[in-house]
Amino acid sequence: VVRRISAMSPTWGGDFPQLELENIKHAFLTHIHSDHSGGLSDLILSPWVLGRDSPLYLFGPKGLKDMASNITNAYKLDIDYRLDGSQPANEFGYKTIVEEISEGIVFKDTNIEVTAFYNNHGGLKNSFGYLFVSKDKRILFSGDTAVSTNLISYANKVDILVHEVFSSEGFKTKTDDWKIYHEAHHTSSIDLGLLAEKIQP
């Protein structure tokens, strides 16, 4: 994914300066299920291979420090090979600075404020959504979640709601065990419609 993004930047022949890899400085993870963190090694290492010279800041739930450390340990042979002179490489760009978060403001600069909030992803205790607030926009990213009263409280006056959803029609075709799982961990299209009606993004 990172290489496809970089191909659209001017450095690699594209037309979008916003997609220069040095602009990827921070990443916010909602939870550490594999389907939401499997690409983390790409995000950590590929920008470095392509020239990033500063660490990546990671924000996410407990366990993220171990995950990031294990990724760099798993690729130690590759990292050492590149640092030993097989290609231009620096000793900083593959590193991470990890903040394991709780609910509240987790990042702020002159352009944006990022607030993490607990959502309702079944029995997973450390699962978050994020509210991004700039000078002219409020954007809420739900993460994986069933209907969440806490999310609704953070969604007040958002301009854009990015929310997960499963098909209520498709749900009818699932076996009972999958129905139990989806109802506890995710949001149906019907419930999302009711939520959107309530918060009016």
Regions found by a protein language model. Give the residues of each.
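Binuclear metal-dependent hydrolase catalytic cores
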Residues: 1-140, 153
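Cap/insert and terminal regions of metallo-dependent hydrolase folds
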Residues: 129, 136-140, 146-201
